[in-house]
Amino acid sequence: MSELKDCPLQFHDFKSVDHVKLCPRYTAVLSRSEDDGIGIEELDTLQLELETLLSSASRRLRVLEAETQILTDWQDKKGDRRFLKLGKEHELGTPIKHSKPKKQKLDGKGSHASGPGPGRPKSRNMQQKMQEYEFTDDPVDVPRIPKNDAPNRFWASVEPYCADITNDEIKVLEDLLKTPEDEADYYKIPPLGKHYSQRWAQEDLLEEQKDGARTALSGDKKKGILGPLAELDSKDVDSLLKKSESQHDQPEDGCPFGHLTQRLLQALVEENIISPVEDSPIPEISGKESGTDGASTSPRSQNKPFSAPHTKSLEVRIKEELIAQGLLESDDRPAEDSEDEVLAELRKRQAELKALSAHNRAKKQELLRLAKEEMNRQELRQRVRMADNEVMDAFRKIMAARQKKRTPTKKEKDQAWKALKERESILKLLDG
């Protein structure tokens, strides 16, 4: 009975959680059938109620662990007292109760075994105590309540947007405002390329060249016939195509000059279509002369077109000169086909890109201006904090003087007034 009275256990009265009152949603879900299931809108309420049950169970578990630890400590202290009492009895020479079985065990082991000293029974009893209170199962791990760090993560994500602006960020904005080197490439229109008919003709010639080379390898006879065709390369193919184009591109009237050159010459030459008959006598031509002349001018020579070198370069130079004199309008871009849908779409997207680039550049300039203004305000706020510290130092000095029951000196008063006026001037700059 005395041991029970000395027992330090508190025997807590655990209050059970009223599920109906504190966890109504949890109780309702348990009363349902498996087919009903749980709705999505009920998950938040269920989570809160389950956390309430978990916290209650964790609290009870901690109390039980504390009680177990108290009981273990009390038993250890009680055993230590018994060991001390046993050691004192050994020193006084009093007989030990229940010592016969121990002596028999010691005698059975050997005659050279010494009797139990004052320290040996204590170690053996400690081992018995450890075996008595040895837990067979592992202690139950207390489930930790998950830490709700959502606010910390939120403020950590918001902090970069609320922090002070640095010089590195100003430099980044200035670098963004610089015009990229490849910006002009986005507004260039790629060349149209060769027409499909020309490309097909070139491919056909190259194909014939390859076929000729293959057939030339098969036999010596065919090699003699197709040899020149097999030795053609891509440059020869292009020259052949250009030659054929030049033959087909001759104007109907046989004049090699361009339209601009012809118009310029027509404007400069005076026309005199009707002339008096007296001024232009028709010479009589004899039969021989006419026969010889007729023989000399054959129909083939009359049908041969007139050719002149460098007609294209002459056309270009005349056009440039007329544009320089202001007689012709300059064509910034070549004539375009109105039915070219790809080119129209490309120009549309280029116009949108140009407008978007201008808008982005204006916004970046506005952002840079606001960032520089904010940098100035940050410097003013830093000066306000320094002025606040000076005002507080002056206030502490004056309060220390009053606690010592002495009047503040003129220097301390002037320093306080100076700090106040400086702070007020900085605040005006900050508000302005």
UniProtKB/Swiss-Prot annotation:
Family of the protein in this entry: Belongs to the NGG1 family.
One Pfam family hit: Ada3
Keyword set, alphabetical order: Coiled coil, Nucleus, Transcription, Transcription regulation
Region Disordered, annotated ranges: 88-127, 275-313
Coiled-coil annotated spans: 40-69, 367-407
An annotated GO cellular component: nucleus
InterPro entries: Histone_AcTrfase_su3
Record's compositionally biased regions (Polar residues): 293-305
Function (record text): Functions as a component of the PCAF complex. The PCAF complex is capable of efficiently acetylating histones in a nucleosomal context.
Protein name stated in the entry: Transcriptional adapter 3
Subcellular localization, as worded in the UniProt entry: Nucleus
